[in-house]
Amino acid sequence: MTNFKKITPIIIENWNVQPQKGSVSEAIKEAREEMIFDTSHRMFESGYFDSTIIIGNENLLQKAKKLNFVIFEKIEKKINFGKYLLKIINKYLLDKIFYFGAGSCYFLTKDEFKFISENTIKGQFISNNPVSSDFISFSSSDLTNEIILNFPNIDNYFSSYLMSKTFLKYLKMPVSLGSVFDIDTPNDFAILSKITNNSGNIGNYISNSIFKNIDLDKFIKVLSSKSSEIFVYGRINPLNLYMAEKNIPCKIRFLSEERGLKIRGKASSSLLKYFFKSENFDNLFKLFENICDGGIFDTRIIFSLFAGEYEQEDVYLSDMKIWQKIKNPFIKFFTKKIAESKIPIILGGHSVVNGGLMALSNLVRGKKYDSSYMSQM
């Protein structure tokens, strides 16, 4: 058995329903798996982490077999996360744990890995967001079995759960592209591809996937112009927006609302909802075209307010503006309007208006994360 002496990364990649072959959901699943391996390898090579324990299905196991920096645990059909975590801790005698989501941590640097390692060893628990976290580091010896057993099944809630149930000293990860950038949508992959020149396993995958057809150039051109103005809408962290704004010449007009939507599950109130009700959609889209030269929208709020029941595949198709294949009537209508817009508009979720915009602003500033840079991270 592996002797765990450092920080042990753990990830659960749990797809309860296998995506339909050829779907956007399938492409996202496969791309996230490549990201897991790239990120796990970089953590292991940094010298601050042990092998990553990956908990997943048989398909992921086949990909992981030949890798010396991962240990694979086959997932159970119905998983209770807390029960499974305690089982893994006891099986491998783990103490210092770094749990990360598949789409996170890709741009964390070696210095940031060092920061996580040193402060976790000091007894602090760390995450990139106290409310909805993408990664979290803690010592299992500081927790009772009862606390571990009752971990929420949704990993974004881990940080807020520990803050509410324990007296552990919390340390928020400093804001950077590495701590903010997370991949949940097709446009996140397109942005990753753009700023890395398709480095690593994930870059190779994207360059041969449906994501390679996503055009970001028109929007990047708008970001690069002093005379341009963009509209950013969604669950925007003001600090992330400030850091992006420092890098880009264009002006930013933004509306930030509904942060915490994922935890609540439904949009509660919305200024945009008021605008949509007071103006018809045609007038509102014309307004966007008149007041700005480009946009980047977190559509999950809009769909929560107006779309009713919908499949995740419809959301991904909307992100890629493939409105013809969308089943939900509202999402189809909305996406068609965006696709026909005279200005370039990027669609996505929380990640695209935070880490995505920050990454594009770095690109405009001239900072590329090519293979030579990635090798130093």
Feature names for model-found ranges:
Residues N153-M377:
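Conserved alpha/beta core of the MobA/IspD/sugar-nucleotide pyrophosphorylase nucleotidyltransferase superfamily
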Residues C105-S132:
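Conserved donor-nucleotide/metal-binding helix-loop-beta segment in metal-dependent transferases, i.e.
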Residues L60-I97, Y106, I331:
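Short phosphate-binding loop-to-helix
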Residues Y48-E58:
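Short beta-strand/loop segment that forms part of the nucleotide-sugar
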Residues F100-A102:
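Active-site acidic Asp-centered loop
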Residues F125, S140-K165:
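Short, glycine-/small-residue-rich phosphate/pyrophosphate-handling segment
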Residues R32-F49:
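A short, N-terminal amphipathic alpha-helix
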Residues M1-K21:
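N-terminal nucleotide-binding beta1-loop-alpha1 segment
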